[in-house]
UniProtKB/Swiss-Prot annotation:
Gene3D superfamilies: 3.40.50.12230. Belongs to the Fmt family. Attaches a formyl group to the free amino group of methionyl-tRNA(fMet). The formyl group appears to play a dual role in the initiator identity of N-formylmethionyl-tRNA by promoting its recognition by IF2 and preventing the misappropriation of this tRNA by the elongation apparatus. It catalyses: L-methionyl-tRNA(fMet) + (6R)-10-formyltetrahydrofolate = N-formyl-L-methionyl-tRNA(fMet) + (6S)-5,6,7,8-tetrahydrofolate + H(+). This is Methionyl-tRNA formyltransferase. Keywords: Protein biosynthesis, Transferase. The lineage of its organism: Bacteria, Pseudomonadati, Pseudomonadota, Alphaproteobacteria, Rickettsiales.
Length: 303
């Protein structure tokens, strides 16, 4: 088949590589987001997919929108049998959805219809889900509402963070994509159950609420890795790894109390958050053991 691949972040690289390395299908072009300034020097940086595509000698297009007639005409000229979309970042208009023989298919890292939207992996961790998975669906005009072509489950380990779980789901999605492309004529699409649909939003707040339980705080640290933070005496302190425990003897203490020199933090419901790896703003990351050597932490406040 002739395939147009649309993707942008690291998550989509495995899917592209899986087509290149494990199928006989031809990728006629790759679509990705335009290069953006990144880093302290604001150097114009290509997306991971852009870089990988160029390494393989593939033609890359970076339109700002697919709604323009000229862009749609170019896709028609490429004559794709199918368009594969993996975390592309642009809306696919109905005019494009209808161009390929087999339409557009999307890899979504959740067990649809649970966790539709922009942050399904984050939400699975935040809500304490014991399992998640990958859904490959036939795209329509809705928000992750298309019929399911293939779906597989994956257990979430207690120590998984957004990085480790994304890698696992990316690998699973790549293997599933090969299966779908090689059997596309024999697949029977299954409609999603709208009664079970849940939705996610892009996450913009990375603050850890100490007034929640320590278990919830740990989920947030894992889901927002490595950006979750508390304020330590007014300065941002990132917590990259943590554990928690219960202690009924501390019920009289208010949340945010620092219990000892190891910086165990009282949270809601007699739960204690134990930071393990931290990073003060402007500093390098370090173990909590090294961090507390520089402070008498019980004299400081956590918010």
């Amino acid at each position: 088949m002739r395939i147009i691949f649309m993707g942008s972040p690291e998550f989509s690289v495995v899917a592209l590589s899986s087509i290149l390395n494990n199928t006989e299908h031809k990728i006629v072009s790759v679509y990705t987001r335009v290069p953006k300034p990144a880093g302290r020097g604001k150097v114009l940086t290509k997306t991971p997919i852009h870089t990988v595509a160029e390494m393989h000698g593939l033609t890359v297009y970076t339109p700002k929108s697919l709604k323009r007639i000229e862009e749609q005409d170019r896709i028609k000229e490429l004559n794709p049998d199918v368009i594969v979309v993996v975390a592309y970042g642009l809306i696919i208009p109905k005019e494009v959805l209808s161009i390929p023989k087999y339409g557009c298919i999307n890899i979504h890292p959740s067990l649809l219809p649970r966790w539709r939207g922009a942050a399904p992996i984050h939400y699975a961790i935040l809500h304490g889900d014991s399992q998640t998975g990958v859904t490959i669906m036939q795209m329509n005009e809705g928000w992750d509402e298309g019929d399911i072509l293939l779906q597989k489950k994956l257990s979430i380990d207690e120590q998984d963070n957004i990085e480790t779980l994304s890698n696992k789901l990316s690998n699973l999605g790549g293997a599933m994509l090969v299966e779908v492309l090689n059997n596309i004529d024999n697949l029977v699409p299954v409609a999603q159950n709208e009664d079970n649909a849940t939705y996610t939003n892009k996450i913009e707040d990375f603050h850890i609420d100490i007034n929640e339980t320590a278990e919830v705080a740990c989920r947030r640290i894992r889901a927002l890795y490595p950006r979750a933070f508390v304020f330590f005496n007014g300065k941002r302190l990132r917590i990259l790894q943590a554990s928690y425990y219960y202690d009924d003897s501390i019920s009289s203490l208010k949340p945010s109390s620092i219990l000892n020199s190891g910086m165990h933090i009282k949270c809601k419901g007699n739960t204690i958050l134990v930071p393990l790896v931290v990073q003060m703003e402007g500093k390098t990351l370090c173990s909590i053991k090294d961090f507390v050597c520089g402070y008498n932490v019980k004299d400081y406040s956590i918010t």
